Amino acid sequence: MRWGVLICDDVGMNIASVDTPVGRLGLVEEDGAITQLLWNAQDSGERTDLLEEGCSQISAYFAGELDEFDLPMRVAGSDFQRAVCDAMLAIPLGETRTYGEIASTVGASAQAVGNACGCNPIPVIIPCHRVLGANNLGGFSGAGGVEMKVKLLRHEGAAGLLI
């Protein structure tokens, strides 16, 4: 594990990064909660127990030993964005939902759900990659775009849904 500190607008955020099969992923902790997952995070700084646990869970997920993350998280954004994140968290490993199915759950349009998925600050852990278009993969705002979405779905055993 590697550790880093990111300073943004005079607010210090602890970052721990871990190498994975899809690249280096960095977890951001603020005030005892995970607030972001960053792609290709930089290393340096202090270590916290929460970040150590988060990196351990990410490693276990990619080793096929973890189906569901158990970390305190705080999602910035509107009540609607948080509702979409909650709906994504309810999608089990190896399964997918469409933007329309999530829209029915949260009482919004599929396009609004897609926009909220694109603003997901904690991808992989909040599994926006499990949300697909009705007739296509939809998008993915993480590093690598839709190709990364496919890699994550294959890792989870949901690749058969892509054919």
Describe the function of each predicted region:
Residues 2-108, 155-163:
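Basic nucleic-acid-binding alpha-helical/helix-turn surface characteristic of O6-alkylguanine DNA
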Residues 88, 128-129, 152:
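Structural signal for hydrophobic
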Residues 118:
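Residue-level detection of the helix-turn-helix DNA-binding "recognition helix"
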Residues 125-133:
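Short Lys/Arg-enriched helix C-cap and helix-to-coil transition segments
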Residues 135-163:
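…primarily DNA-binding HTH/wHTH and HhH modules…
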